[in-house]
Amino acid sequence: MEQRLKKTPTLTLGCATACAKFALIVILFIPALSAGKFRSDRPDGAIPKQIVKIVDVRERQPPKEFVRIYSIVRSYRSDIAESEIWRISDVIFEESAKRAIDPLLVLALIHVESRFQSAAVSPMGARGMMQIMPDTGKFLAETLAREDGFYPAAFRPESLDDPVLNVRLGIYYLQDLHKQFQHLNLALAAYNCGPGEIQNRVENNLQMSDEFATLVLDAYQRFKKTKTPVL
């Protein structure tokens, strides 16, 4: 990237997401409790205080945006462990908020790039869910190391097969490209074929294809129409 990357304020959502997960788990078990499958041994039939506290968690619903992300990821990757779906949804939710990018746009980009396949490798060598080139991934990881103190040990091309790392770097990259080009279509085109190529075409008033951006934005509109599941 030609433009110097700037530091972005960090928004910590890990705790909120963890609470959301716990609330979801509890909600799933509420019907069993209310149906009388939990029975008190006390003479008055009262539910012990510690159980009442757990049941009260029903009032704390997970963020709707997180639930929508989770449902979309799960619809494409029902073949993987539930814990992995949580992990992917979590990083999309947190990093999108941190970088002020609509998570549905991130999901659309992932859909077009890899169909949510974390082990995808393109003929050009781009890897992972957001199809990041190894050299670009290494540069992005080094930049995040300076900003956030984050750096995966012994970065290798295969490091990009980890969906959490891949998504974190991909969202950061998309944010920076949008800052550089100030236009979503151009940022998406640069994500696809490199910022140097797009910068050259902009400076020399050369024609460029909107095909990739159109695919992403079409998927984005479809995801925006997806109804959030009711828990």
What are these regions (language model features)?
Residues 54-231:
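Catalytic glycan-binding domains that act on GlcNAc-containing polysaccharides
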